[in-house]
Amino acid sequence: MIKTKNLKKNYKSLQVLNGLDLNISKSEIVSIVGASGAGKTSLLQILGTLDKPSNKDCELIIDDIEVLGMSEKDLCNFRNTKIGFIFQFHQLLPEFTAIENVCLPAFIKKTNRIDVIKRANELLCYLNLEDKINNKPSELSGGEQQRVAVARALINNPQIIFADEPSGNLDTTSAENLYKLFFDIRDKYNTTFIIVTHNQKLADLADRKIEIIDGDIN
């Protein structure tokens, strides 16, 4: 599903990633851990095509496609079709309702409006938010807001979801429920998850845990 070879990243003189080789299988849930500044988020952003490696002699293959040579337009279309994102701060638009927030990526993709609304309703019901569909983010708890963000990440049927500290803003119970939800989604949709987290207990629940130390995989 995802393969990297000799992936490097530096910010001026600071080397963040030191030539990483990585293989992630379809439907695998992988956690990425490490100290602050170790390179976790930099790796996640490159894998998610939000950033590019610093070196040219590297590979990033997603779903058998080498993505580093894509034009910006093709890469944007690829990202919107294949990939979903979940962040610590859900980034829901406050002026829109839950279902409107969920629908946005599919509207950008120009999917049929009726089909989008139907799927958004199905996802919100699946995530036990059927009675919150028309609520705005300010009317939802932190855990509910994050579940809306999960539904938004799923709206385009992505093969891969990248999550950057998705439970960092949640209490312990909500965080554990969120991780259980990831496994349920994987089992239902065969989705691959790559999760950056500081929470070692939750990281240990993943199929595989990758530790980044000073830009290298331990």
What residue ranges belong to the model's regions?
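Conserved ABC transporter NBD signature motif
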Residues: 56-66
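Conserved ABC ATPase signature
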Residues: 136-146
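Short coil-to-helix segment of the ABC ATPase nucleotide-binding domain corresponding to the Q-loop/switch region
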Residues: 96-105
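A short, proline-enriched helix->beta-strand linker immediately N-terminal to the Walker B motif
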Residues: 155-159
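Helix-to-loop junction immediately C-terminal to a conserved catalytic motif
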Residues: 48
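Catalytic Walker B motif of ABC-type/P-loop ATPase nucleotide-binding domains
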Residues: 161-164
